[in-house]
């Protein structure tokens, strides 16, 4: 009989009532809506941003990649902080940074200032997401899958429907208003914090008096940042000496991180977490799926505009059917985890993403672009509902917050790799060719699912 993905562990501490996964999922899903809109909405506005700021279209990929990069980097940091502090503090700090960075991005006079704002906002988004998923992931039994499915559906719908929102806002208010959309998370925060006790019942805490491994955090940050930068080095015209220096910094960071893990097993990247059975496959498979999805999200609106001759509003409206697929996908994948083995579910999600990327790359016309985007949306929504929530099942209770942060880092980093790779390849080959090459990434995730499946204890 195939092994189903088990449900999450029970919440720590005593409680006089059973937490409702649907109610909690709705509250948290509403909170993450603005930041997920911030993923899809700017993709439609990128052509307008490039024209307004007088930069090449490929350079605007940084607007998506910067957000995904710092979002991914903030997740393990937030995970370690939640092992020492209340998730409420992490959540509030994340939402404040999200709003402040988005306000800066929306008012930035040049692309570098806009990117700085997106970097700050992305870090806030990452902290918010890890706090949200930590709370939902600690629910017991089917309530966990239910809450994660609702959050995944909300995130996928918002990020893909963000193209419609972005198109409408770009057409009526301008691209700056699009980048400022995440500021709307601030008024939603009080509603999510109505039941503060929920955010304190996320299981055991460890090392509450320990110090954060800043060296390990810095090494991981430099490694991830150098990877994203190198992928886009050609598209932004970085000189060869600068590119080599970034590559050297990335290599040194990789060596330093490896040395730090051996010297400090309980550091920022604990060896016992990385070595946990199924942890690396889950993170890598999820990252490849996210890379494929965000690569499609970066290019699809531009391709539709080229084919139809319309503007941002038309492109966003045409992508709405693809967004609608996220709702049934998130719920269906959650139900399938009871019937199929984890490797079957993850392989199916990767396969959907591969096919979606290739359909968008190979076929012309708005219908194939929408159909391919819909397939990629299904993979994205399913990965959030299943793979992102696996951390509590892969490690000991005391490592859950740390593992959640690192696993989310690996998965969400793919969101930065996807558009960066497409933008970098588009400078040496046609855009569709670059997107077709990107399909190799989720294809590798499919192969990994079949050979080293992400399983739980």
Positions of PLM-derived features:
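Cytoplasmic helix-loop-helix junction between adjacent transmembrane helices
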Residues: 119-154
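Membrane-embedded alpha-helical segments of multi-pass transporters/permeases
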Residues: 103-107, 190-195, 255-258, 358-362, ...
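Helix-capping/helix-break motifs at membrane-protein junctions
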Residues: 140-141, 197, 396
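Intrinsic disorder in cytosolic terminal tails and internal cytosolic loops
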Residues: 1-20, 202-206, 451-457
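12-transmembrane solute porter fold
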Residues: 20-101, 132-133, 172-173, 177-183, ...
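Hydrophobic transmembrane-helix bundles of small-molecule transporters
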Residues: 171-284
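Glycine-rich segments within core transmembrane alpha-helices of 12-TM secondary carriers
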Residues: 149-162, 410-418
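Cytoplasmic-side transmembrane-helix entry/capping segments in multi-pass membrane proteins
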Residues: 91, 144-154, 209-218, 274-275, ...
